[in-house]
C-alpha cells in the first residue's frame, strides 16, 4: 500500500493544479449555466478565460443552444467581457451538415427560430408543408406557436424522425431563473 502525505495547505494544491494546467494546450468551456447565465457572466468567468489565455492555453466555447449563430455568441461573449471570435464557438447548428438524417436531401419541417431554418436550408430542403416533410428538426424557439407544434407532430405521426438540436429541458438564466429549453419540446 502506498501512503501519501496529506496535503496541508492550499498552496500545495494550487502548485499541483498549476503543474497540471501547464500540460493543457486547449480547453472547451460550456456556456449556458457555466460561463454565463442568460445575460450575466458567471463569477470570475472573464478572469479564468484571461488567465488561461495568458498561460498560452487555447480557449473555445461550446453551446448546445440552437438559436443564434456563432457570430451572435462570439459578440455576446465579447460584450460580456470575454473577447471571442466566431471560430472560437461550436454550436449544434454547424453540425447539421454531417448528420445522417439529412443525407439524401429530405424535406425538413423546421420547428425553431429563423436562424435554425436558415442553417437547415444550407444543407437540406425545408418545407412549411407538414404533408411533404420527411422529418422534423427542432431548435429552441421561445415564440413557438401551437399550430407549428401540431404540424411537427403530424410529420412525426407519419413516421418522420425527429432531430433535436439539443435535449436540455431547462436553461439557467440571470437572476437564478430557469426557462424551458429545446428538450422541453
Task: Give residue spans per PLM region.
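HAD-like aspartate-dependent phosphatase fold
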Residues: 1-31, 35-185
Amino acid at each position: 500500500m502506498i501512503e501519501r502525505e496529506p496535503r496541508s495547505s492550499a498552496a500545495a494544491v494550487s502548485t499541483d493544479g498549476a503543474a497540471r494546467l501547464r500540460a493543457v494546450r486547449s480547453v472547451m468551456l460550456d456556456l449556458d449555466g457555466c460561463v454565463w447565465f442568460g445575460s450575466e457572466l458567471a463569477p470570475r468567468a472573464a478572469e479564468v478565460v484571461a488567465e488561461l489565455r495568458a498561460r498560452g492555453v487555447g480557449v473555445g466555447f461550446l453551446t448546445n443552444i440552437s438559436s443564434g449563430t456563432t457570430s451572435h455568441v462570439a459578440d455576446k461573449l465579447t460584450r460580456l467581457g470575454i473577447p471571442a471570435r466566431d471560430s472560437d464557438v461550436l454550436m449544434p447548428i454547424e453540425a447539421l451538415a454531417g448528420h445522417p438524417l439529412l443525407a439524401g436531401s429530405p424535406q425538413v419541417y423546421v420547428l425553431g427560430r429563423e436562424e435554425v431554418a436558415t442553417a437547415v436550408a444550407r444543407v437540406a430542403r425545408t418545407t412549411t408543408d407538414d404533408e411533404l416533410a420527411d422529418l422534423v428538426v427542432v431548435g429552441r424557439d421561445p415564440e413557438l406557436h401551437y399550430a407549428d407544434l401540431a404540424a411537427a407532430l403530424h410529420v412525426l405521426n407519419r413516421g418522420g424522425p425527429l432531430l433535436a438540436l439539443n435535449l436540455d429541458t431547462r436553461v439557467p438564466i440571470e437572476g437564478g431563473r430557469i426557462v424551458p429549453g429545446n428538450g422541453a419540446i
